[in-house]
Amino acid sequence: MTFENRNNRKTLTGKVVSAQKTQKTIIVEVDRYKKHLLYGKRFKKTKRYAVHDEAQVAKVNDMVMIMETRPLSKTKHFRLYQVLSTASDVEKEAK
């Protein structure tokens, strides 16, 4: 695989909703906004992805970027690419 093809992989941004329950796996919720074909109203679709976290750095409520990869198990087809913001950063901004 060339380096150019590696950059064409799908990347998604979402929130970690489950971590440290299974080794090296986190669950990330990704929100997408779609438009109804007939009525035109926008609505939110949420999908949960099982993501491989080799270093186990992601915690619950972290915002992360995930990247598509080869199938690692029956449900894991994404890996952790980058932690965008941690849960403690989000709490500090809220106060």
Swiss-Prot record:
CDD domains: Ribosomal_uS17. One of its GO terms (cellular component) is cytosolic small ribosomal subunit. Keywords: Ribonucleoprotein, Ribosomal protein, RNA-binding, rRNA-binding. InterPro entries: NA-bd_OB-fold (IPR012340), Ribosomal_uS17 (IPR000266), Ribosomal_uS17_bact/chlr (IPR019984). GO terms for biological process: translation. Part of the 30S ribosomal subunit. Belongs to the universal ribosomal protein uS17 family. One of the primary rRNA binding proteins, it binds specifically to the 5'-end of 16S ribosomal RNA. This is Small ribosomal subunit protein uS17. It comes from Mycoplasmopsis synoviae (strain 53). The lineage of its organism: Bacteria, Bacillati, Mycoplasmatota, Mycoplasmoidales, Metamycoplasmataceae.
